[in-house]
Amino acid sequence: MGLKDELTTFCHDVFNGNWETTEGKNVPDEDSRLTLKNTAITIDGTVLYADLDGSTAMVDGYKNWFAAEIYKTYLYCCARIIAAEGGVVTAYDGDRVMALFIGERKNTRAARAAMKIKWAVDEIIMPKKDARYTSNKFALKHVTGIDTCSLFVAKTGARGANDLVWVGRAANYAAKLTSLPSTYTYITESVYKMLADEAKTSNGKSMWEKVTWNTFNNSTIYRSNWRWRID
């Protein structure tokens, strides 16, 4: 079969085939029983995106090995904090990481992870960087976005070169939130409504500010510059 015929057959089969969906109990991965045909897993999940801000300027203005050290330390801290809060890293994309939280208190755990990442940047990564490079003025800036919804997970790509696609509002909104100013962590209203009190207030003071997402349908979102100490 020639390449044109192969592509035509595949597209015909996808558009005309029935979907076989199962309800997920665990975070799907590449070993899940998903195929390149119309198979999918549905799962209720909270998506966290953590993204470095200004990475283009960093790679343009600093040595490649220094940029790599920033990537490595930031993404390592993100991954370990996410895991400690019961989340699962589902993808790395250059200078950012996507993670999924499922089960009880998934929104609270995701929000807590975001605040811990902020603390780690300020209290671990930057002090270690400054101690090693005393004349280097680089300041690591980052932003985290979180949303929650029911996700439709399918396998995309071709044999030997494929990945999972997370279809649903949460993956898109969480990623878009990271385009907002890096001073804050951002969550959607859906996430905020599901937060436990411990992730909403501290000593009677709100940890979140209600704002309007002017560049995205004037949606209501919440932002926070609070941090969560890691012991």
Swiss-Prot record:
Catalytic activity reads:
UTP = 3',5'-cyclic UMP + diphosphate
Q: What is its EC number?
A: 4.6.1.26
Stored SUPFAM superfamilies: Nucleotide cyclase (SSF55073)
| Domain of life where this protein originates | Bacteria
Binding positions for Mn(2+) 1 per the UniProt entry: D51, D95
List all disulphide bridges recorded for this chain.
Answer: none
Q: Which residues form the Guanylate cyclase domain?
A: 46-178
Name the chain's protein: Uridylate cyclase
Tell me, in one coarse class, where this protein mainly resides: cytoplasm
| Compartment(s) where it occurs, according to its Swiss-Prot or TrEMBL record | Cytoplasm
One BP term from GO: defense response to virus
What does the record give under GO molecular function?
Answer: lyase activity; metal ion binding; nucleotide binding
Family as reported in the entry's similarity comment: Belongs to the adenylyl cyclase class-4/guanylyl cyclase family. Pyrimidine cyclase subfamily.
Outline the inducing conditions.
Expression is probably induced by infection with phage T7.
Q: Which residues bind a ribonucleoside 5'-triphosphate?
A: Y49, R96
Give, as one word, the top-level EC class.
lyase
Name its co-factor(s).
Answer: Mn(2+)
